[in-house]
Amino acid sequence: MKVIALLTLCVTLFCQGYSNSLDSCQGRCGYGTDNNFSCQCNTSCERFKDCCSDYAEQCKAGATSCKGRCDEKYNSQNKCHCNSKCSRYNNCCSDYTDICDSDAGGGGSVITDADIKAVSEVLYALDSNKATASELIIDPQALVHDSQTSSQRDLSSRPLFRYVDGTLLSRPTYAAFLAVLDNYHRMTGQVEDFSPQQLSEQETFIKEAMSNTELGRELFAFLYTKGVYASENEFLHDLKMMWFGLYSRYNNKMDSSGFEHIFAGEIKGGKVSGFHNWIQFYRLEKRGQLNYYSHSFNGPWTTFPDVMGMQFKWDGYFKQVGSAVIGCSPEFDFALYSLCYITRPGKQCRLSLGGKELIIQTYTWDKTTYGNGKKFIASAFPSTP
């Protein structure tokens, strides 16, 4: 599957960086206030009168393509539509047939379930940064039935993570990932306002995970050959927007993103929301901020990565089932969720890891968009029985 020319292309294109015009909303819709730009592209700009001149066209009702919008819910503000009913009402976007009349997940040639399973096996084999049995030791303890997951009973007297080798977490992708985890307010309703340093940390993580690993380059090569992206620059920028672009989960505040929800975790309505990452679990458990109660699922894998569904409290806030891939590298987690979201947005995505099936459930954020009507990631997680 690897193509030498593609790797050369990747290096060349990455050097172009993430370039945006300072006075345009192209590729910036919904992103948090950034003083490095001369104008802004989120809902707050309407209140503060500092929107870019193309804000309405780019961010509100200007979507004229179905790329990234297949099967989206009807929105009367959109100029054209990309769901199964648009043909009946004669209001499909002009590229609906080319992009959505297949199960391709967003453009180019059809991406079949077999394609996804095949590339997930390749990514699994390429995860050279995953934990080994000597670098990570877990202590699952109490296994509960699905009917008991809401009981909020602490059935495990010891932490889940018995030992994690510190040198594992100092590797470049782990270090870059940890740097981003510290940048969020966990309570929904609190505005996320990033400093230039924090924005730089987001880009560093994407670079380390996707451009500086063979695993990340393989994911791009797959999506490139399927026609989903025309260049690595487009791929990296889209990852940045779908994962780090901000939207509002509560009270019209720009308080959330796919990355925060899935990897860092949030508190909403008095309970834990999201939180599907083993590294965040470990660091909070080590600090005494997280109390592991039990698990309701432990996957069939006998080496890392494994998959678990866990019950726990985070500073007193309960999570009934927090599923996560355990012991994988940050780039593997990021790549699997990205693969599934890009190819199966809002659906179940069937992967194969070492010959064993893993189902990832993805959800799209349907209230706001970025770019030409593309949707942010709302959630993605292992679907455990």
Curated annotation (Swiss-Prot):
- Tell me the first and last residues of the signal peptide: 1-21
**Location in the cell:** Secreted
- Key words of the record: Disulfide bond, Endonuclease, Hydrolase, Lyase, Manganese, Metal-binding, Nuclease, Repeat, RNA-binding, Secreted, Signal
Q: Which reactions fall under this protein's catalytic activity? A: ribonucleotidyl-uridine-RNA = a 5'-end dephospho-uridine-RNA + a 3'-end 2',3'-cyclophospho-ribonucleotide-RNA
Q: What class of enzyme is it?
A: lyase
The EndoU domain is annotated at: 112-385
User: Entry's InterPro entries?
Assistant: ENDOU (IPR039787), EndoU-like (IPR037227), EndoU_C (IPR018998), SMB_chordata (IPR020436), Somatomedin_B-like_dom_sf (IPR036024), Somatomedin_B_dom (IPR001212)
Question: EC number(s) of the enzyme?
Answer: 4.6.1.-
Kindly list the cysteine pairs connected by disulfide bridges.
Answer: C25-C29, C25-C41, C29-C59, C39-C41, C39-C52, C45-C51, C52-C59, C66-C70, C66-C82, C70-C100, C80-C82, C80-C93, C86-C92, C93-C100
Q: Which residues form a coiled coil?
A: none
Annotated active site? H261, H276, K319
Q: Which GO terms describe its molecular function?
A: lyase activity; metal ion binding; polysaccharide binding; RNA binding; RNA endonuclease activity; scavenger receptor activity
* Similarity field: Belongs to the ENDOU family.
Describe the task this protein carries out: Endoribonuclease that cleaves single-stranded RNAs at 5' of uridylates and releases a product with a 2',3'-cyclic phosphate at the 3'-end. The UU and GU sites are more efficiently cleaved than CU and AU sites.
Q: What is this protein called?
A: Uridylate-specific endoribonuclease
Annotated organism of origin: Paralichthys olivaceus
Query: What gene name is listed for this protein?
Result: endou
